[in-house]
Swiss-Prot record:
It comes from the Bacteria. It holds the Pfam family HTH_17. GO terms for molecular function: DNA binding. The lineage of its organism: Bacteria, Bacillati, Actinomycetota, Actinomycetes, Mycobacteriales. SUPFAM superfamilies: Putative DNA-binding domain. InterPro entries: DNA-bd_dom_put_sf, HTH_17, SinI_DNA-bd. It comes from Mycobacterium tuberculosis (strain CDC 1551 / Oshkosh). This is Putative DNA-binding protein MT0521.
Length: 78
């Protein structure tokens, strides 16, 4: 029998009893949003172009950081 204690911390925005101001995304989720490979996201993180938080052996990226990067990285072809 599976016990459900409600939504997870990630779903509700709560981290260790405190409300988080932004949602944290995995590298795979960021790659899907930006329509690039996971390697490209890792490259952006390691180059300091996309701020990320290290959680164990993986990275989490604030959704606002992804949104801000997409808003400021338009290229004018004209």
């Amino acid at each position: 029998m599976t016990s459900t204690n409600g939504p997870s911390a990630r779903d509700t925005g709560f981290v260790e009893g405190q409300q988080a101001k932004t949602q944290l995304l995995t590298v795979a989720e960021v790659a899907a949003l930006m329509r690039v490979s996971k390697m490209t996201v890792y490259r952006l993180v390691h180059n300091g172009e996309l701020p990320a938080v290290r959680v164990g052996r993986s990275f989490r990226v604030h959704a606002k950081a992804v949104h801000d990067m997409l808003e400021t990285s338009y290229f004018d072809a004209g």
